[in-house]
Design a protein with these regions (language model features):
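N-terminal acidic, glycine/proline-rich low-complexity segments
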Residues: 1-256
Length: 256
């Protein structure tokens, strides 16, 4: 809140084979996790957190929900709103479907597809491909930070996290605990993809981007490159050292 005017935290659906939860249950689990982070930061007001879509567009889900309603409300009242998406695009796609007029008032920064670098196996893309199609076709201003091989460079280990964070505050201790106990044990390095989206908004000088014509998504979910469609931004480099330096400084600050 000291850097950005955060108006909402919206929960996106997810489903992964490692987690035995339905898509709907994942919304509640993510909501509870967001509330826990608020508690660790001594933030009492959890009204900023909104539950989102309980299924994917690709499964026929087409319902309004608190997250979609809030996205539309915020977009309509502001001249410009940045939406930082670290999951699938279901909530954003439905907001655009229900209120297409917001397209000129929002900009989406998405941890998403890696189609410029070979076969696209990105998790956030595959979760709800129909939502990606809606967002691409809307012509919304869009920046994509591909998971592999770009944001996957944000690799860390429990040794680094404990060296930089452990004992600094409640949140830092919890983040170390979560990293270690999500199967990222002492011998495993793991990328913190999600921090890239926030870092991009903090300092774009840590990134290189290129403008490309928005691709089409084929029926087999591959991409067709184009030349004359609207442009989107695509991140093709990041400075991991600067991003981690800033992250550790902020997490251990007395003002957190």
């Amino acid at each position: 809140q000291k850097i950005f005017n955060i108006e909402a935290i919206t929960i996106a659906p997810f489903k992964h084979s490692k987690w035995q939860k339905t898509v709907s249950e994942s919304i509640d689990a993510s909501y509870n996790e967001a509330c826990k982070i608020f508690d660790l930061l001594d933030l009492k007001d959890k009204s900023l957190i909104y539950k989102g879509s309980r299924d994917y567009l690709k499964n026929g889900y087409n319902e309004k929900n608190p997250a979609i309603n809030k996205i539309i409300e915020i977009a309509n009242k502001n001249n410009k709103t940045y939406i930082l998406a670290i999951g699938c695009l279901t909530n954003i796609a439905l907001a655009l479907k229900y209120n297409p007029e917001i397209v000129d008032k929002i900009e989406v920064i998405w941890l998403g597809s890696n189609f410029l670098f070979g076969p696209n196996k990105d998790f956030n893309f595959a979760q709800d491909i129909e939502a990606v199609k809606v967002v691409f076709e809307s012509k919304v201003r869009l920046t994509i930070l591909p998971c592999s091989p770009i944001t996957s460079n944000l690799m860390t280990s429990i040794y680094e996290l404990e060296s930089e964070l452990k004992g600094k505050n409640k949140l830092c201790d919890y983040l170390c605990y979560r990293f270690y106990n999500r199967s990222h044990g002492p011998t495993k390095r793991w990328p913190l993809w999600d921090i890239s989206v926030i870092a991009y908004m903090i300092n774009k000088n840590w990134f290189n981007t290129i403008d490309i014509s928005c691709p089409l998504i084929n029926n087999d979910n591959t991409f067709k490159f184009t030349k004359n469609r609207h442009n989107i931004k695509f991140v093709n480099y990041l400075n991991a050292n600067e991003i981690f330096k800033d992250l550790f400084e902020k997490l251990t600050s007395d003002n957190i």
